[in-house]
Protein backbone atom coordinates (compact mmCIF):
# COMPACT_ATOMS: atom_id res chain seq x y z
CA UNK A 1 0.00 0.00 0.00
CA UNK A 2 2.86 2.40 0.75
CA UNK A 3 4.22 1.68 -2.73
CA UNK A 4 0.91 2.53 -4.41
CA UNK A 5 0.51 5.72 -2.42
CA UNK A 6 4.07 6.69 -3.20
CA UNK A 7 3.47 6.26 -6.91
CA UNK A 8 0.26 8.25 -6.65
CA UNK A 9 2.16 11.08 -4.97
CA UNK A 10 4.63 11.15 -7.86
CA UNK A 11 1.75 11.27 -10.35
CA UNK A 12 0.32 14.30 -8.57
CA UNK A 13 3.66 16.11 -8.37
CA UNK A 14 4.19 15.53 -12.09
CA UNK A 15 0.63 16.57 -12.92
CA UNK A 16 -0.14 13.14 -14.40
CA UNK A 17 -3.59 11.58 -14.24
CA UNK A 18 -3.62 7.82 -13.61
CA UNK A 19 -6.23 6.02 -15.73
CA UNK A 20 -7.41 2.42 -15.29
CA UNK A 21 -9.65 0.28 -17.50
CA UNK A 22 -10.75 -3.14 -16.26
CA UNK A 23 -8.06 -3.15 -13.58
CA UNK A 24 -5.33 -2.37 -16.13
CA UNK A 25 -3.39 0.89 -16.29
CA UNK A 26 -3.28 3.15 -19.34
CA UNK A 27 0.38 4.11 -19.88
CA UNK A 28 1.30 7.18 -21.92
CA UNK A 29 4.87 8.48 -22.33
CA UNK A 30 4.82 10.52 -19.11
CA UNK A 31 3.30 7.66 -17.15
CA UNK A 32 5.95 5.27 -18.47
CA UNK A 33 8.73 7.55 -17.25
CA UNK A 34 7.22 7.72 -13.77
CA UNK A 35 6.56 3.97 -13.58
CA UNK A 36 10.12 3.22 -14.70
CA UNK A 37 11.57 5.67 -12.20
CA UNK A 38 9.49 4.52 -9.23
CA UNK A 39 9.06 0.77 -9.77
CA UNK A 40 12.33 0.14 -11.61
CA UNK A 41 14.25 2.33 -9.19
CA UNK A 42 12.97 3.44 -5.79
CA UNK A 43 10.55 0.62 -4.98
CA UNK A 44 12.68 -2.17 -6.42
CA UNK A 45 15.83 -1.07 -4.61
CA UNK A 46 14.02 -0.53 -1.31
CA UNK A 47 12.77 -4.12 -1.49
CA UNK A 48 16.27 -5.36 -2.30
CA UNK A 49 17.70 -3.37 0.62
CA UNK A 50 15.07 -4.79 2.96
CA UNK A 51 15.87 -8.35 1.88
CA UNK A 52 19.59 -7.75 2.29
CA UNK A 53 18.92 -6.56 5.84
CA UNK A 54 17.32 -9.96 6.49
CA UNK A 55 20.37 -11.78 5.16
CA UNK A 56 18.77 -12.62 1.81
CA UNK A 57 21.03 -12.07 -1.19
CA UNK A 58 18.66 -10.28 -3.57
CA UNK A 59 19.13 -8.75 -7.01
CA UNK A 60 16.78 -6.11 -8.42
CA UNK A 61 15.94 -6.49 -12.10
CA UNK A 62 13.64 -5.24 -14.84
CA UNK A 63 12.77 -7.28 -17.90
CA UNK A 64 15.40 -5.36 -19.89
CA UNK A 65 18.25 -6.50 -17.63
CA UNK A 66 20.06 -9.44 -19.24
CA UNK A 67 17.06 -9.73 -21.60
CA UNK A 68 15.07 -11.28 -18.77
CA UNK A 69 11.59 -10.61 -20.19
CA UNK A 70 10.76 -9.47 -23.71
CA UNK A 71 7.33 -8.10 -24.57
CA UNK A 72 5.39 -6.83 -27.53
CA UNK A 73 3.57 -3.53 -27.19
CA UNK A 74 -0.09 -4.33 -26.75
CA UNK A 75 -1.96 -3.64 -30.01
CA UNK A 76 -4.70 -1.04 -30.03
CA UNK A 77 -8.16 -2.59 -29.78
CA UNK A 78 -11.28 -1.26 -28.11
CA UNK A 79 -8.87 0.32 -25.62
CA UNK A 80 -5.46 1.85 -26.36
CA UNK A 81 -3.38 0.89 -23.32
CA UNK A 82 -0.39 2.86 -24.56
CA UNK A 83 3.10 1.66 -23.67
CA UNK A 84 1.99 -1.61 -22.11
CA UNK A 85 3.79 -4.87 -22.81
CA UNK A 86 2.44 -8.38 -23.27
CA UNK A 87 5.17 -10.85 -22.33
CA UNK A 88 6.39 -13.04 -25.18
CA UNK A 89 9.66 -14.46 -23.90
CA UNK A 90 11.18 -15.20 -20.49
CA UNK A 91 14.80 -16.14 -19.88
CA UNK A 92 13.97 -19.14 -17.68
CA UNK A 93 17.55 -20.40 -17.63
CA UNK A 94 18.76 -17.06 -16.25
CA UNK A 95 16.19 -17.06 -13.46
CA UNK A 96 16.99 -20.66 -12.57
CA UNK A 97 20.72 -19.92 -12.61
CA UNK A 98 20.31 -17.02 -10.17
CA UNK A 99 18.27 -19.16 -7.79
CA UNK A 100 20.79 -22.01 -7.96
CA UNK A 101 23.42 -19.45 -6.92
CA UNK A 102 21.36 -18.46 -3.89
CA UNK A 103 20.27 -15.15 -5.41
CA UNK A 104 16.65 -14.00 -5.04
CA UNK A 105 15.49 -12.04 -8.12
CA UNK A 106 13.29 -9.03 -7.34
CA UNK A 107 11.44 -8.22 -10.55
CA UNK A 108 10.03 -4.78 -11.31
CA UNK A 109 6.84 -4.69 -13.42
CA UNK A 110 8.73 -3.50 -16.49
CA UNK A 111 9.71 -5.35 -19.65
CA UNK A 112 11.30 -4.31 -22.95
CA UNK A 113 10.65 -4.86 -26.64
CA UNK A 114 14.32 -5.48 -27.58
CA UNK A 115 14.13 -2.38 -29.75
CA UNK A 116 15.23 0.02 -27.04
CA UNK A 117 11.85 0.68 -25.43
CA UNK A 118 10.66 -0.08 -21.92
CA UNK A 119 7.06 -1.24 -21.46
CA UNK A 120 4.84 -1.11 -18.40
CA UNK A 121 3.67 -4.64 -17.58
CA UNK A 122 1.09 -5.79 -15.05
CA UNK A 123 2.89 -6.90 -11.88
CA UNK A 124 0.76 -10.02 -11.54
CA UNK A 125 1.65 -10.91 -15.12
CA UNK A 126 5.35 -10.56 -14.29
CA UNK A 127 4.94 -12.88 -11.29
CA UNK A 128 2.89 -15.35 -13.30
CA UNK A 129 5.31 -15.43 -16.23
CA UNK A 130 8.27 -15.91 -13.88
CA UNK A 131 6.46 -18.76 -12.11
CA UNK A 132 5.59 -20.43 -15.42
CA UNK A 133 9.20 -20.18 -16.58
CA UNK A 134 10.56 -21.56 -13.30
CA UNK A 135 8.09 -24.46 -13.37
CA UNK A 136 10.37 -25.96 -16.02
CA UNK A 137 13.14 -26.18 -13.42
CA UNK A 138 11.44 -26.39 -10.00
CA UNK A 139 8.20 -27.31 -8.23
CA UNK A 140 6.60 -23.88 -7.99
CA UNK A 141 3.92 -22.36 -5.78
CA UNK A 142 2.86 -18.90 -6.96
CA UNK A 143 1.63 -16.55 -4.25
CA UNK A 144 -0.08 -13.25 -4.93
CA UNK A 145 0.07 -11.07 -1.81
CA UNK A 146 -2.01 -7.92 -1.43
CA UNK A 147 -3.92 -6.00 1.24
CA UNK A 148 -6.89 -8.40 1.49
CA UNK A 149 -7.01 -11.87 3.07
CA UNK A 150 -7.90 -13.49 -0.25
CA UNK A 151 -10.55 -13.28 -2.95
CA UNK A 152 -13.63 -11.86 -1.22
CA UNK A 153 -17.33 -12.46 -1.85
CA UNK A 154 -18.00 -9.04 -0.34
CA UNK A 155 -15.27 -6.43 -0.78
CA UNK A 156 -16.53 -4.67 2.36
CA UNK A 157 -16.20 -7.81 4.50
CA UNK A 158 -12.58 -8.89 5.02
CA UNK A 159 -13.77 -12.21 6.45
CA UNK A 160 -15.75 -13.23 3.33
CA UNK A 161 -12.79 -15.08 1.84
CA UNK A 162 -13.53 -17.61 -0.89
CA UNK A 163 -11.30 -20.55 0.19
CA UNK A 164 -11.06 -22.18 -3.26
CA UNK A 165 -11.95 -21.12 -6.77
CA UNK A 166 -11.85 -22.84 -10.14
CA UNK A 167 -12.47 -21.50 -13.65
CA UNK A 168 -16.21 -22.14 -13.60
CA UNK A 169 -16.70 -20.35 -10.29
CA UNK A 170 -14.45 -17.51 -11.48
CA UNK A 171 -16.57 -16.92 -14.58
CA UNK A 172 -19.75 -16.99 -12.51
CA UNK A 173 -18.35 -14.52 -9.97
CA UNK A 174 -17.23 -12.15 -12.74
CA UNK A 175 -20.64 -12.30 -14.42
CA UNK A 176 -22.33 -11.57 -11.09
CA UNK A 177 -20.01 -8.64 -10.42
CA UNK A 178 -18.54 -10.27 -7.30
CA UNK A 179 -15.04 -10.34 -8.81
CA UNK A 180 -14.03 -7.19 -10.66
CA UNK A 181 -11.24 -4.68 -11.23
CA UNK A 182 -7.66 -5.76 -10.57
CA UNK A 183 -8.73 -9.14 -9.23
CA UNK A 184 -9.74 -10.25 -12.72
CA UNK A 185 -6.23 -10.16 -14.28
CA UNK A 186 -4.83 -11.61 -11.04
CA UNK A 187 -7.03 -14.68 -11.38
CA UNK A 188 -6.52 -14.90 -15.13
CA UNK A 189 -2.78 -15.04 -14.50
CA UNK A 190 -3.37 -17.69 -11.83
CA UNK A 191 -5.17 -20.04 -14.22
CA UNK A 192 -2.57 -19.51 -16.93
CA UNK A 193 0.18 -20.38 -14.45
CA UNK A 194 -1.53 -23.62 -13.44
CA UNK A 195 -1.98 -24.57 -17.10
CA UNK A 196 1.77 -24.05 -17.57
CA UNK A 197 2.77 -26.42 -14.77
CA UNK A 198 2.75 -24.30 -11.61
CA UNK A 199 1.76 -26.57 -8.71
CA UNK A 200 -0.67 -24.19 -7.03
CA UNK A 201 -1.59 -20.53 -6.71
CA UNK A 202 -2.48 -18.85 -3.43
CA UNK A 203 -3.95 -15.35 -3.10
CA UNK A 204 -3.52 -13.96 0.40
CA UNK A 205 -2.02 -11.29 2.65
CA UNK A 206 1.74 -11.26 3.06
CA UNK A 207 1.29 -11.76 6.82
CA UNK A 208 -0.66 -14.98 6.19
CA UNK A 209 1.82 -16.69 3.84
CA UNK A 210 2.89 -19.28 6.40
CA UNK A 211 -0.57 -19.80 7.90
CA UNK A 212 -2.18 -21.59 4.97
CA UNK A 213 -4.87 -18.93 4.70
CA UNK A 214 -6.25 -17.17 1.65
CA UNK A 215 -7.78 -18.38 -1.61
CA UNK A 216 -6.41 -21.42 -3.41
CA UNK A 217 -6.81 -21.27 -7.18
CA UNK A 218 -7.01 -24.57 -9.04
Regions found by a protein language model. Give the residues of each.
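Single conserved hydrophobic/aromatic residue that forms the stacking wall/gate
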Residues: 1-11
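Glycine-rich phosphate/pyrophosphate-binding loops
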Residues: 59-62, 68-69, 135-152, 201-205
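Polyanion-binding loop/helix "lid" in catalytic or ligand-binding cores
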Residues: 29-56, 109-114, 118-133, 161-210
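Anionic-ligand binding region
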Residues: 80-98, 112-116, 124-135
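Ligand-binding beta-strand-loop-alpha-helix segment within the catalytic cores
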Residues: 12-106
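Short, basic/aromatic-enriched C-terminal tail that caps enzymatic domains
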Residues: 209-218
Amino acid sequence: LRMSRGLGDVYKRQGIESKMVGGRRITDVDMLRVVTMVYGGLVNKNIVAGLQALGINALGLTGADMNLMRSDKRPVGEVDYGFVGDVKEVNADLLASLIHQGIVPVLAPLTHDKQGHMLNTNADTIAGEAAKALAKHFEVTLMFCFEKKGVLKDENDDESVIPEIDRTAFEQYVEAGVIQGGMIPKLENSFQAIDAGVKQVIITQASDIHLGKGTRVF
